[in-house]
Amino acid sequence: MTYRLPFFYLILLILLSSCETLKQSSKYQFIDGFYKTNLDGGVRTIYVLAGSDTIKAYRKSDLGTGKIDSTKAILIRFPSKKPDKFSNLSFNSKTFDVDVLTVLFKYRPPVKDFPPQFNTTFNGAAYFGYRTDVYKLSYKETPMHIFNRRIIHYGYSIGLFSGLGTARIDEYVTNNALSIQYDGLVNLSGIALILAVDKLTAGLTFGEDRLLDKNHSVWVNNAKPWIGLSIGLNIN
C-alpha cells in the first residue's frame, strides 16, 4: 500500500494536468492544414482553409513561393443548413502522436505453472506514435426534416510506450524464493494501438514488465508478455 497510493496520485495529477492541453488540442478539430482527400475523383494532398460556411482547398501544385492565386482555390460550400448540391467528403491528416496513458488492466498468459492472471495495478506511461485523423463532412436529417451540418472525427495511431508501475511481489509469484510481500516498482514498455473518437482515446497494448530491484530474477512475470486495455490523453 505504501507504493500504490502516492503513485496513483501521481498518475491522477498527470491526467488532470493534461485536460487543459486536451481542450486546446487541434487533433479533433477540422482546421486549416494539409489533408488527403478524394476531390476531383482521385486522392490528392491539398491545403485547406476552413471557413465558417465555405472551405477553400488548394492543390499543392498551386502553392508556390510567391502570392497565392485565390482564383485557383476549390470552393466547397458547407453552411449550417444543407445546400441543394452536396456530396459527403472525407479528409485525412497524418501527424506524430505524443500521449500519456495508463493501462487499466493486464491479461497475463499462463507461466511457470501459474494460471492466466488478470492484474489492475497502478501505472503510467508516455506514448509516441504515428497517427491518422479522419474528418467526415456530412449533414444529418432531424425529425423536422432539416439537414444540419456535422463533422465526424476519429483517429487511430500505432506506436511505442514506456513508463512505471507497480506489481505485487510475494512468495507465490517468486516460487517461494521470498518470504516477504511488497509492491515492487516495474518498468512497463511495449506497443500500443490507439483509437480516438473526438476527445476519448483508448488503446490495446502489448507489453512486458521488468521489476526494478534485485528480486527481478525470481519474479515469474519478469519480462513476460501481457495484453492490456489503456486510456490516455493527447498532449501535442
Label for each model-derived stretch:
Residues 96-100, 124, 154-162, 202-204, ...:
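Transmembrane beta-strands of outer-membrane beta-barrel proteins
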Residues 102-108, 132-134, 162-168, 197-199, ...:
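Transmembrane beta-strands of outer-membrane beta-barrel pores
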Residues 23, 27, 191, 198-236:
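Predominantly the C-terminal beta-signal and adjacent terminal strand-loop region
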Residues 94, 118-124, 154, 183-189, ...:
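Residues that define the transmembrane beta-barrel architecture of outer-membrane proteins
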Residues 110-115, 140-141, 170-177, 215-219:
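Outer-membrane beta-barrel translocator domains and adjoining extracellular loop/strand segments
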Residues 2-10, 15-104:
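N-terminal leader/presequence regions that precede the main folded/catalytic core
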Residues 155-187, 192:
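Outer membrane beta-barrel transmembrane domains
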Residues 85-95, 134-156, 200:
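Short loop/turn motifs that connect adjacent beta-strands in outer-membrane beta-barrel proteins
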